[in-house]
């Protein structure tokens, strides 16, 4: 087990999670363990802690599968395409992972094996995966809340602590990942030539700056004032009473209590399902409705490229088709 705080190279980590350990004990093949340690140590210089833990999690699952199904395999040179095909069936049917999750893990494993193959000069493991193996969610669409669901949810935010309510409104208006909202710093807001900008430090990737409206800037400024008064020694805006950052699980705990106590329902009559990333998807769909180009949407969402933007456009088109179905059916009958 590695405690990353004790290494000479400490990767970027998410302060709201506080996860610093890497556990290699489940990898029982000696060569597998030695090589993956070497690879992940090199990644500590360039990748965030969350990415490194994801790589270890994906490799650990594969190593456990190989130990259980093919215990005779001790070296990377002995891994075959047939074994990979067995693993594809296993991860898609026996693990309970969603298509997005197992596709992500397969892509991570593919990249790791390719890197290991180049490191050890083992050509065969660089080509064990086919491009089609890691394409399970090409047709998957992001999920978004309807306008009515957002209104019902926001009306109940007054039941939360005011600062937590501000956090959730700001989260919706920024369209950020929840860890990026919860780790906003007090110096995030700036002004230039009468326009406001916010600096967002993405825990997964990088730092970027984007414009915000006067209304949102005023809400952020109020949250900063409250934070400075209640916790003068912290650099962050959104803090618990004990001065610690909110974790996403703690946030969900408070919000879910609010949902059940106030009987907040979705459009199908079920309890409102609070998913922080769905607000980001909703924000992305709203941007497509504003007729923005893909590059502008990607910049506002903090994406490095435009690869995922078509998913938001497809979701918007499917929602529009559903909303107009009754009218179109009636017109077809005329």
Language-model regions, residue ranges each:
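Charge-rich, intrinsically disordered N-terminal extensions
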Residues: 1-129, 156-159, 169-170
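Flexible interdomain linker/hinge and immediately adjacent N-terminus
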Residues: 7-24, 121-155, 199-206, 238-246
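Short, charged phosphate-coordinating catalytic segments
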Residues: 118-122, 171-192, 295
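Basic, Lys/Arg- and aromatic-enriched nucleic-acid-binding interface segment
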Residues: 148-178, 280
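Conserved tyrosine-mediated DNA breakage-rejoining catalytic core shared by Y-recombinases
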Residues: 184-221, 307
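Catalytic-site neighborhood detector that most strongly recognizes the C-terminal catalytic loop/helix
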Residues: 201-206, 301-332
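Active-site/catalytic core of tyrosine-dependent DNA strand-transfer enzymes
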Residues: 215-270
């Amino acid at each position: 087990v590695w405690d990353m705080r004790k290494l000479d190279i400490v990767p970027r980590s998410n302060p709201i999670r506080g996860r610093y350990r890497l556990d290699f004990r489940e990898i029982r093949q000696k060569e597998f363990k030695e090589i993956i340690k070497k690879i992940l140590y090199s990644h500590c210089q360039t990748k965030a802690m969350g990415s490194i833990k994801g790589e270890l999690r994906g490799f650990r699952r594969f190593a456990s599968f190989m130990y259980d199904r093919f215990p005779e395999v001790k070296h990377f040179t002995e891994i075959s395409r047939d074994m990979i095909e067995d693993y594809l069936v296993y991860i898609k049917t026996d693990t309970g992972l969603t298509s997005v999750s197992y596709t992500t893990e397969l892509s991570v494993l593919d990249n790791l094996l390719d890197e290991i193959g180049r490191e050890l000069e083992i050509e065969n493991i660089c080509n064990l995966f086919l491009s089609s193996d890691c394409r399970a969610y090409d047709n998957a669409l992001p999920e978004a809340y309807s306008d009515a669901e957002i209104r019902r949810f926001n009306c109940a935010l007054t039941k939360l602590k005011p600062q937590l309510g501000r956090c959730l409104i700001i989260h919706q208006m920024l369209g950020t990942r929840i860890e990026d909202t919860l780790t906003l710093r007090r110096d995030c807001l700036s002004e230039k030539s009468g326009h406001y900008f916010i600096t967002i430090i993405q825990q997964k990737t990088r730092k970027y700056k984007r414009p915000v409206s006067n209304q949102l800037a005023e809400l952020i400024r109020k949250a900063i004032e409250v934070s400075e008064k209640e916790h003068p020694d912290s650099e962050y805006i959104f803090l618990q009473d004990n001065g610690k950052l909110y974790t996403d699980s703690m946030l969900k705990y408070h919000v879910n209590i609010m949902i059940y106590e106030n009987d907040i329902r979705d459009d199908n009559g079920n309890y409102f399902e609070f998913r922080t990333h769905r607000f980001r998807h909703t924000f992305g769909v709203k941007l497509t409705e504003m007729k923005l180009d893909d590059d502008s949407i990607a910049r506002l969402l903090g994406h490095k490229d435009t690869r995922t933007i078509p998913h938001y456009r497809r979701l918007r088109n499917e929602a529009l088709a559903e909303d107009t179905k009754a009218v179109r059916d009636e017109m077809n009958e005329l």
